[in-house]
Amino acid sequence: MKTKRTFLAISIPCSTEFPAMVERLKKNLQHEHYINYVKTNQIHLTLKFAGETLEEDVPAIIEACQKVAKRHQPFVLDFDRTGLFGSNRVPRVLWLGMANPPQALFDLEEDLLDAFDELGYLRDRQNFVPHLTVCRIKQLVDKQFFLQIYNSIEQKTYLHADVKELVYFQSFLQPTGPFYKVLKKIPLGQ
């Protein structure tokens, strides 16, 4: 049986503020060779990572997502704060999130997880933390300097997104980083 590595997300268009912030990080942390930055043209907020998905299940997943999307209206997201996954001792991911994510996002995510559960793609045990990955950290040469740079990031709105659709992606892992192919765009409220 053939599979595809898939996930459902909200694709986030880049403003000028976000790439500028990433470039400042790269410049300030240029001596850190084990940090992989997400390409700014691939920024997305993952709602459900399905992982290895049977090709024969893809049409049913798309149909289920379309049914859910019809019940939800477009909404707005403002990404205005940064955070770390891992810990200050061992940071693993630097992310951009929201101080006050809208309830509409959580309602949509919950309905989508229910739909995926019904198809046998069960939810993760982790709580949903809506975020955009800025970079993944394999190892730090100078952890204190990294934390100093991280703590100096201005907390302001870096991205504003009018969410009008979901995107079902296929992910290809490559040595240079992941590549995403759009399988289906699914409008909200239609």
PLM regions: where:
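Histidine-dependent nucleotide/RNA phosphoesterase domain, centered on the 2H-phosphoesterase fold
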Residues: 1-190
